[in-house]
Amino acid sequence: MKFFTLATIVALSAQIGFAAAPPAAFNVRDFGAVGDGTNKDTVAFQKALDSCAVAGGGEVLVPAGKYLIGSVQLGNRTILRLETNSVITGSADANDYPMMDIRWEGRWQPGRRALIYAANVDHTGIVGPGRIEGNPAVAAPQNPRGVVVLEPISCNDVRWEGFTVTQGGNWATHPTYCTDVTIKNLKIIGNRDGIDVDSCKNVRIEKCDINTGDDSISLKSGRGLDGARIGKPTENVLIENCNLVGRRFACLAAC
């Protein structure tokens, strides 16, 4: 019979190591999502996202299929994982995007909430390889701003990686008042801005392929007296190894 001291067991444990537990997973289909591109899956998505946040965080899984949704909101420690051949498509109905105060061209004003939105949360993001499609039909005289596809506001540790975004009636992505933002290996296609970094700090944009009709990447920090009053600069931004095509305005702009 062999005996092991506590010190020996601890040493062996340190050498072998223990695998970290996988993140909790919440499949949108388990919450009623259909994924046929016709029936709206907004409620199912929001239930999955809320359950993930309440459980302390994890991943919300979007399996293959085409999911028609209105605006949904991500919570704390929640990653939306778009699996292979998964497509999220924004609804064409403006009523599926609640009205709220939004940041637009450097000022706060009433507007429609983004397709995928987050506010005042930590450790949130979206990872691929799926696709998110905005809906240009939402942009109309009664909604001149259109609907941004991805818009976290006042969030910390935001991660977007490895998926495709096609624009709808507005900018593709608009992180606002966020800290520690990582945007990596995104493909963005559309006729408006690709990435608008608005009064954010510690932002890394790398290995992205952006082809837009307007600015590919734009750095913003407010406008006029309102921008001076709020006093939130965009700072410490690293952009590297990106392919940028701006067909009408700038590939990289600061305004």
PLM regions and their residue ranges:
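Bacterial N-terminal signal peptides
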Residues: 5-17
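Extracellular/periplasmic carbohydrate-active domains that bind, remodel
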Residues: 18-255
